[in-house]
Design a protein with these regions (language model features):
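N-terminal small/glycine-rich loop or linker at the start of catalytic domains
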Residues: 1-17, 74, 127, 133-142, ...
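Conserved N-terminal beta1-alpha1 strand-loop-helix module at the mouth
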Residues: 1-53, 59-69
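Short, well-ordered coil/turn segments that N-cap beta-strands
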Residues: 1-2, 36-38, 72-77, 101-104, ...
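Active-site glycine- and acidic-residue-rich loops that bind
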Residues: 19-21, 139-149, 176, 199-205
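Active-site beta->alpha loop and helix N-cap motifs at the rims of alpha/beta catalytic domains
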Residues: 39, 44-154
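Catalytic alpha/beta core domains of metabolic enzymes, predominantly
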Residues: 164-231
Length: 231
């Protein structure tokens, strides 16, 4: 079975600056709680109060609890953290300590070239934050998908701390055959890590690429309603 994570509110927030009406959110949760979606990524948690970003970039514990109650018991609630806002493990511990027992999963979108820095932060944070599952989204797949050795090296670095990694076509430029060939190799060579995918729709191929990755053995896929999201 392929696990589905819907990130409509989080990724769709790039269109609305994370402002969503209560009515829209209510209708969204009425629908998503009935769909075969395993995990719902509802936005960001952030201590950065600059700018005019809406509630779904600055989610608080009370609101997250309310959202979680609208999901099925077997659905997990997830949030993204803007890795650029985290300078050290103390920042991350301070931020996440407010959400233990509320958030099931946090994800970081990380440039593979900076993986060591963020893995060190996550490793230290996990010693204090025990009830949240940490995952990484590896960005810029189109830049390095031809280099299987590089991809395996990055995934191997993550293995002891991260059990699930989503590979992200940040520019939405990959083609289905490229996706199939890459995921066929990378999944078969990393059987102890759950490999997921996240495709952007710049070329109108996000759905086709997702299906190609699943056909190649990818075990987790990100989705949004109507393809709403960055790119």
């Amino acid at each position: 079975m392929v696990k589905i994570l819907d990130c409509t509110l989080r990724d769709g927030g790039y269109y609305t600056d994370w402002h969503f009406s209560n009515l829209l959110v209510e209708k969204y949760f009425q629908s998503i709680s009935k769909l075969p979606v395993d995990e719902v990524e509802v936005g960001y948690v952030s201590d950065n109060q600059k700018g005019n970003s809406g509630l779904y970039y600055h989610l608080n514990k009370t609101h997250l609890k309310n959202l979680k109650q609208r999901l099925r018991n077997n659905q997990k609630i997830c949030c993204m953290i803007n890795a650029k806002e985290i300078k050290n493990h103390k920042d991350l511990i301070k931020l996440l300590s407010k959400f233990e027992g509320t958030i099931d999963v946090v994800r970081f979108s990380v440039d593979p070239l900076k993986i060591d820095f963020y893995l060190n932060i996550i490793r230290k944070t996990k010693k204090k934050i025990k009830k949240i599952n940490f995952r990484i989204n590896l960005m810029y797949l189109s830049k390095w998908f031809k280099d299987i050795n590089f991809a395996n090296k990055i995934i191997n670095k993550c293995k002891s701390d991260i059990k699930e990694i989503a590979l992200v076509d940040s520019y939405g430029s990959l083609q289905p055959l490229q996706v199939f060939n890459f995921f066929k190799k990378i999944v078969s060579q990393n059987k102890n890590t759950l490999i997921g995918c996240h495709f952007h729709n710049n070329c109108g191929l996000a759905l086709a690429n997702t299906l190609s990755a699943i056909e190649a053995g990818c075990r987790s896929a990100d989705s949004t309603l109507k393809g709403m999201g960055r790119g």
